[in-house]
């Protein structure tokens, strides 16, 4: 626990159904109890939210990743924002560890929607005054909002794990980006670990189907660490791991901030060349979706620090610079 000076303050933290364990951990780190609210569903599927304490004049923080089931968790968030606005909260700060629809951030083809922008519009219209996000799939999504966005990074948490692991020598590692779009992320991890980087050139013939083509960088004899922001069906990451093994990698580790792990992901990872998968708890991961070789790291401390700094009107940039 960081401190207990906020127990009788106007700081309120609420959790919806998206990741209650993470929200509780964040509240414990801040040193306050979670706010009292109920989230129920009517028989026809409609959501009913009731805030069970006064929040008039309070700085409210709502923790809710919009992960699976995405639409249900998004509606919970929008309804809670509206409830806080009508209950006269001073500020409504949403903490979104995982931003659903982030991969629909541009018009890849004619007549396609930009759903990431639509979600931003919905959040703002509902009444949110600030968003704390973690590793947005595309950083430019921040530009879809007219409210302040604090964009936290998961790379330092992942990097600390590899630096502290006695079985890994960073001097013998290479950080690998599974595609060209992830080079910036891979470079950040490589800078912290002081390792070289490599890039996998992949082609995706259709959604959720990836084909690894070739590898740019020195791999042979090194421990490869693949880093991505999201692992969904795990097609990309497992094909990348096998390609690295074929190129002479000694061992292959994989890491990501957001373990979506849908469909065949669990089976693919367990049967792949990946020795260990390191993820964060930005998304609640049921045991039946978690591969047996998974290590989960907590982002609660990072989020708790961000909440305290926002509440105290202090700079948040020290957390992601």
Curated annotation (Swiss-Prot):
Top-level EC class: transferase
Residues that coordinate or bind Mg(2+) 2: 179
Keywords tagged on the record: ATP-binding, Cytoplasm, Kinase, Magnesium, Metal-binding, Nucleotide biosynthesis, Nucleotide-binding, Transferase
Pathway annotation: Metabolic intermediate biosynthesis; 5-phospho-alpha-D-ribose 1-diphosphate biosynthesis; 5-phospho-alpha-D-ribose 1-diphosphate from D-ribose 5-phosphate (route I): step 1/1
Catalysed reactions, semicolon-separated: D-ribose 5-phosphate + ATP = 5-phospho-alpha-D-ribose 1-diphosphate + AMP + H(+)
GO MF annotations, alphabetized: ATP binding; kinase activity; magnesium ion binding; ribose phosphate diphosphokinase activity
Binding of ATP, residues: 44-46, 103-104
GO biological process, one term: purine nucleotide biosynthetic process
Positions of D-ribose 5-phosphate binding: 204, 228, 232-236
Keyword Ligase annotated: no
Cofactor note: Binds 2 Mg(2+) ions per subunit.
The keyword Nucleotide-binding is assigned to this record: yes
Catalytic residues as annotated in Swiss-Prot or TrEMBL: 202
Family: Belongs to the ribose-phosphate pyrophosphokinase family. Class I subfamily.
Name of this protein: Ribose-phosphate pyrophosphokinase
Organism field: Staphylococcus aureus (strain COL)
This protein's encoding gene: prs
